[in-house]
Design a protein with these regions (language model features):
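Intrinsic low-complexity, repeat-rich intrinsically disordered segments enriched
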Residues: 103-108
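Exposed beta-strand/loop interface patches that mediate assembly or binding
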Residues: 1-99
Length: 108
């Protein structure tokens, strides 16, 4: 087993959110395209990601045919400037629910 094949950065190129687990097509760093990659989300939270979002892809046992995505993020839309301990739920249109040091703020 090659350890460098266990954990990889990937870019989402297509997705299907109609299943119980979202199915992704990702391009792993180095150009390898993986189909039918399951995206595991935390219980109680979900979002419909855009192609171009970035993922941390794990290949079980180093086998890229057994790849799953455990974290998907999209730096194009992520708010910045939060203070330590603050939390923000956000979307691609700039709407936010912001748990700030001054209280809860809803924008948009």
């Amino acid at each position: 087993m090659n350890l460098k094949d266990l954990i990889n950065r990937a870019v989402v190129s297509a997705k299907n959110g109609s299943k119980k687990l979202r199915i992704l097509q990702v391009q792993i760093l180095g150009g390898d395209i993986r189909e039918s990659v399951e995206h595991f989300e935390p219980y109680g939270f979900t979002s419909e990601i855009h192609p171009g979002a970035e993922a941390v892809a794990i290949s079980l046992g180093g086998d890229r045919d057994q790849t799953l995505a455990i974290v998907v993020t999209d730096r194009r839309y992520r708010p910045t400037g939060l203070k330590d301990g603050e939390v923000c739920i956000f979307d691609d249109l700039g709407r936010k629910i912001f748990l700030s040091r001054d209280g809860i703020k809803v924008e948009g």
